[in-house]
A protein has these predicted regions:
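Short, conserved beta-strand element in jelly-roll/cupin
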Residues: 48-49, 59-75
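Structural motif
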Residues: 65, 72-74, 81, 97, ...
Length: 129
């Protein structure tokens, strides 16, 4: 955790994503930007994708959950197209190829959680499909 986060909250167990430096979350695989934190076993991030932008087809070796806080995500996964609206959780099974794009109506902000098993084994956490 950054010193800024610990100082602002005054508690090493309280993570303030809004005070953390923002960066690209998946590099060239996605337009998503935000702040993230690695626990011992779980990765967590607060991500924003600008309207109409998002990820290329990719997969993660570990199970992932995205909870949409604002806006909506258009998703293509498992041969289906669907929308994940505000207030809904999007579950991505391990190794499932997916694409997630903010709808044209506005930016999408979501919390992401992913286990870190593969990362701790030295495997890439994201692979383009």
């Amino acid at each position: 955790m950054s010193a800024t986060t610990a100082t602002k909250t005054g508690n090493k167990y309280v993570i303030d994503f809004h005070s953390m430096e923002k960066s690209s979350i998946l590099g060239k695989t996605s337009t998503g930007e935000g702040a993230s934190f690695n626990g011992d076993r779980i990765y967590c991030g607060l991500v924003t994708k600008k309207k109409g932008t998002g990820s290329k087809a990719h997969f993660h070796p570990d199970e992932t959950f995205n909870y949409v806080l604002k806006g909506a995500l258009k998703v293509h996964m498992d041969g289906m197209d669907f929308v994940v609206p505000t207030g809904c959780l999007f579950h991505i099974p391990a190794n499932m190829v997916h694409i997630a794009v903010a709808t044209e109506e506005g930016d999408a902000t979501y919390l992401v959680w992913r286990d870190r098993v593969a990362e701790k084994q030295g495997k890439p956490i994201t692979t383009e499909a």
